[in-house]
């Protein structure tokens, strides 16, 4: 009996000779064939979506059989949880960090106020899209109610980051940090802003070593000598976001790593000291660049600080590098973040095929600090400051987590 004609999953042509996808065979996915090796390779990235969907389906079936989905996933064999995701199995990594599988998405109680993207199937913020289309000016927050609402969000964000940093140690997984952030946010009647924002799958960004930003929490355990950035944003019951991040040295970090973290802190501190009415937003990048360069570091150009408040991201756009063309002059009532990402090597970055994790192109380490601030009549107010630290002051002990 001759082989029946089937369609190539790459080009769609009818084929008789069946080149089966080995991963589909492993997962039990039928009738997934290609006409030749070249077609298979050129279409593999898109084809992997089928693998991901099947893996999620299998996981859901396992969870239903166990009667408790989250517990079942957490109790899965360690080797299974730490396996490489499908997209990573043929990916050319730039450094030593590797991703693992992800835990199930955490749920948010119905009573928590949520931003518009929380329920959007693709995580789109329609309010941000309308803002970009219709508004080119920087919003000024004037009323006491608005300002108190933003201050509350920033205070809640600070408390959540403090809780997360207490849990950070050698051997803890970044997924556990995500659990702490998620639960601490809910306890404060806040929504963890990263969750489902353009489909980001977790409640906090955890960026380790060569990861510049947007690292996704997973089952990898934090290692002795890692530097780990925790980026927390919460959305409060008043409808405002508060955003901050800090980088920590975990265990025995070498001199270069500790100096990098301190340099990133100093870059932010120098920029914050310039905040006052009349300062050009573009000038922040100049002082950040000079500080980084003086310490033999570089400044990432792809990602910027941003306006924040009722929207997660809005005007102004604040590049951290010199000779940028940022528009705008600071005025009382402006609320925004500054968040320079500082690298030990070159400034170039690439994004993993998870579509989120930004890493250094040369695999060298990166560090970052971020605050949300309000421009006042005479200067600024650091809304996400540590307790009793209205002005940024370096204290290495604050950013060190021993074994």
Residue positions per predicted region:
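Cys/His/Pro-rich metal-binding microdomains
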Residues: 9, 22, 33-40
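Active-site neighborhoods and metal-handling regions in enzymes and metal-associated proteins
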Residues: 2-4, 12-20, 25-29, 44, ...
